[in-house]
């Protein structure tokens, strides 16, 4: 399958190029979208990809787009994909309502998977969080997420996804149960998220379930960002023969 990398100059984009250089499970890098000069040496690739700032040409040259860009960038990409539908795997977070609506429109034309986190470990953390939220009915739930000092969105998309999982298990009103700036006493049907930014932390998420006299903490730490690139490539392979629909990462991992 021919892969197009959108957001190739970013942290995960560079890791995607590195994985594809070795021909990851038969995937071929066919196009790379860049706004400025790309520093990657493509001579090591078995097939020279199209490196372009022409979005339409970039989309036409591939069968699947893997996106790790910025919200505005993804919005522009979706406009191009609506004209020329291709499989989409996106890990871009912090999206506006309009962008999410365009994603739903694309899902009528092509298979896509949008996830705040592409790692198997986070998928498992979500499942454990749902179970703990359901069983520990009297526990107060708090989420702490830590990332590098260059991350732009806070709370992280992964933390918000974990919040949604816990709120759904409890039957809370998802729009009103979230607390990100706590003042005064804690309300019972609330879930807090604290965001920490510093250094070069790839990502750490901890969910605490606090009871009287004891507490449980479930935690996931990313020690290497390559897990996100490999997860996205696995998603591309998984989507290859799927029908048009917006898929969830939990479906991919069974």
Curated annotation (Swiss-Prot):
Pfam families: DapB_C, DapB_N. Its EC number is 1.17.1.8. It is an enzyme of class 1 (oxidoreductase). GO terms for cellular component: cytosol. Keywords: Amino-acid biosynthesis, Cytoplasm, Diaminopimelate biosynthesis, Lysine biosynthesis, NAD, NADP, Oxidoreductase. (S)-2,3,4,5-tetrahydrodipicolinate binds at residues 148, 157-158. The active site is at 147 (proton donor/acceptor), 151 (proton donor). It is found in: Cytoplasm. NADP(+) binds at residue 35. It catalyses: (S)-2,3,4,5-tetrahydrodipicolinate + NAD(+) + H2O = (2S,4S)-4-hydroxy-2,3,4,5-tetrahydrodipicolinate + NADH + H(+); (S)-2,3,4,5-tetrahydrodipicolinate + NADP(+) + H2O = (2S,4S)-4-hydroxy-2,3,4,5-tetrahydrodipicolinate + NADPH + H(+). InterPro entries: DapB_C, DapB_N, DapB_N_CS, DHDPR_bac, NAD(P)-bd_dom_sf. Coiled coil: none annotated. The keyword GTP-binding does not apply. GO terms for biological process: diaminopimelate biosynthetic process; lysine biosynthetic process via diaminopimelate. Pathway: Amino-acid biosynthesis; L-lysine biosynthesis via DAP pathway; (S)-tetrahydrodipicolinate from L-aspartate: step 4/4. GO terms for molecular function: 4-hydroxy-tetrahydrodipicolinate reductase; NAD binding; NADP binding; oxidoreductase activity, acting on CH or CH2 groups, NAD or NADP as acceptor. NAD(+) binds at residues 7-12, 91-93, 115-118. Belongs to the DapB family. HAMAP family: DapB. Catalyzes the conversion of 4-hydroxy-tetrahydrodipicolinate (HTPA) to tetrahydrodipicolinate. This is 4-hydroxy-tetrahydrodipicolinate reductase. It comes from Helicobacter pylori (strain P12).
